[in-house]
């Protein structure tokens, strides 16, 4: 399973641990991923997604999963999130 947020596309970054003596050793910065079920008001059901904690705060800030997906750019969303977004647009059009 990839270490990537399904809503923001946040993934693993690499860098250095730097000691007081300026010795450098390679390290990885992992995203804070959470397995959560987010509810869609328009579709009337929940969706299991693997998202970063920052993305959860963003979803709360804008007012829910539906609003977040409609505002999000398609390049950042996973295939699963894109399918939810398409279903959401169909439900709103009907």
Swiss-Prot record:
<dbReference type="GO" id="GO:0022625">
    <property type="term" value="C:cytosolic large ribosomal subunit"/>
</dbReference>
<dbReference type="InterPro" id="IPR034704">
    <property type="entry name" value="Ribosomal_bL28/bL31-like_sf"/>
</dbReference>
<dbReference type="Pfam" id="PF00830">
    <property type="entry name" value="Ribosomal_L28"/>
</dbReference>
<dbReference type="InterPro" id="IPR026569">
    <property type="entry name" value="Ribosomal_bL28"/>
</dbReference>
<dbReference type="InterPro" id="IPR001383">
    <property type="entry name" value="Ribosomal_bL28_bact-type"/>
</dbReference>
<dbReference type="InterPro" id="IPR037147">
    <property type="entry name" value="Ribosomal_bL28_sf"/>
</dbReference>
<dbReference type="GO" id="GO:0006412">
    <property type="term" value="P:translation"/>
</dbReference>
<protein>
    <recommendedName>
        <fullName>Large ribosomal subunit protein bL28</fullName>
    </recommendedName>
</protein>
<comment type="similarity">
    <text>Belongs to the bacterial ribosomal protein bL28 family.</text>
</comment>
<keyword id="KW-0689">Ribosomal protein</keyword>
<dbReference type="GO" id="GO:0003735">
    <property type="term" value="F:structural constituent of ribosome"/>
</dbReference>
<keyword id="KW-0687">Ribonucleoprotein</keyword>
């Amino acid at each position: 399973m990839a270490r990537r947020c399904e809503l923001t596309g946040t993934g693993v970054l690499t860098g250095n641990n730097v000691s007081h003596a300026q010795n450098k050793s390679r390290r990885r910065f992992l995203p804070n991923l959470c397995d959560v079920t987010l509810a869609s008001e328009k579709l009337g059901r929940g969706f299991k997604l693997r998202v970063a904690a920052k993305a959860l705060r963003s979803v709360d800030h804008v007012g829910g999963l539906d609003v977040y997906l409609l505002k999000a750019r398609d390049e950042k969303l996973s295939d699963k999130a894109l399918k939810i977004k398409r279903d959401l647009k169909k439900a709103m059009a009907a």
